[in-house]
UniProtKB/Swiss-Prot annotation:
Belongs to the thymidylate kinase family. This is Thymidylate kinase. Disulfide bonds: none annotated. ATP binds at residues 7-14. It catalyses: dTMP + ATP = dTDP + ADP. Phosphorylation of dTMP to form dTDP in both de novo and salvage pathways of dTTP synthesis. GO terms for molecular function: ATP binding; dTMP kinase activity. The keyword Disulfide bond does not apply. The keyword Cell wall biogenesis/degradation does not apply.
Length: 192
C-alpha cells in the first residue's frame, strides 16, 4: 500500500511519520523531493535558490525528482507499505500557476500512473502556521510567508477534490491543531 502525507509546512507531517516508524518497522519511508540521490541535489537547488528559477523550469525539476523517485523507490517497493512525506499532490499544489489537467498528465507520466491508495491531509490555520514558522530557520519557500502557505493549502484541497475524480483513493483530512497523540490514533485507524 502506498500512503502519502500531505499538507503545508509546519502542520506535523514529519512528527506523525516519526511516530509511524515505531509501528511499521518494515515499511519503506520516503519523501518528496529528496528521496533519492538525484532528489537530494534537486531539493537543495529548489529550497535554497541562489538565483531565480522560472516556474516552468521549477516544475520540471520537481518532475525529474518524481520520475527518479518512482523508479528507485516506489516501483521497486510497490508490494510493500510505502509511507511518503509529500508526493505529486504537493507538486500540483505548489505549481499553482498551471492547470490541474496539465499537472496531472505530467505527473502521471513521471509516475507511470502509480498513485497512492491513501492520503493523509493535515490542515492548519494561520495561527498554527505562524507559531510554528517562528520556531525554525526558514528556507526559500518558507520565506514566502503565511498568506502564501494558506493559498497553497487551499490549492491542496482543490487538488485532492480533483483527484477524487481521477484516481481511486481514500483521503483522511485532519486538523493539525489536535494533539499529536489524537492525530496519531486517527492515522493508525485509517491505515488498518
Amino acid at each position: 500500500m502506498y500512503v502519502v502525507f500531505e499538507g503545508i509546512d509546519c502542520v506535523g507531517k514529519s512528527t506523525q511519520i516519526s511516530l509511524l516508524k515505531e509501528i511499521y518497522k518494515d515499511a519503506i519511508f520516503t519523501l518528496e523531493p529528496g528521496g533519492t540521490e538525484l532528489g537530494k541535489h534537486l531539493r537543495e537547488i529548489l529550497l535554497n535558490k541562489t538565483h531565480p528559477i522560472n516556474k516552468r523550469a521549477e516544475l520540471l525539476l520537481f518532475l525529474a525528482d518524481r520520475a527518479q523517485h518512482f523508479e528507485e523507490i516506489l516501483k521497486t517497493n510497490q508490494n510493500k507499505l510505502i509511507i511518503s512525506d509529500r508526493s505529486f499532490i504537493s507538486g500540483m499544489a505548489y505549481a499553482k500557476d498551471f492547470e490541474n489537467d496539465l499537472l496531472f498528465a505530467l505527473n502521471s507520466f513521471a509516475l507511470e500512473n502509480f498513485f497512492p491508495q491513501k492520503i493523509i491531509f493535515l490542515k492548519g490555520d494561520a495561527n498554527l502556521i505562524q507559531e510554528r514558522l517562528s520556531q525554525k530557520e526558514l528556507d526559500s519557500i518558507e520565506k514566502r510567508g503565511i498568506e502564501y502557505f494558506l493559498s497553497v493549502q487551499d490549492k491542496l484541497e482543490k487538488v485532492l477534490h480533483f483527484l477524487k475524480e481521477k484516481i481511486s483513493v481514500e483521503i483522511l483530512t485532519l486538523d493539525a491543531k489536535e494533539s499529536k497523540e489524537k492525530l496519531h490514533q486517527q492515522i493508525k485507524e485509517f491505515l488498518q
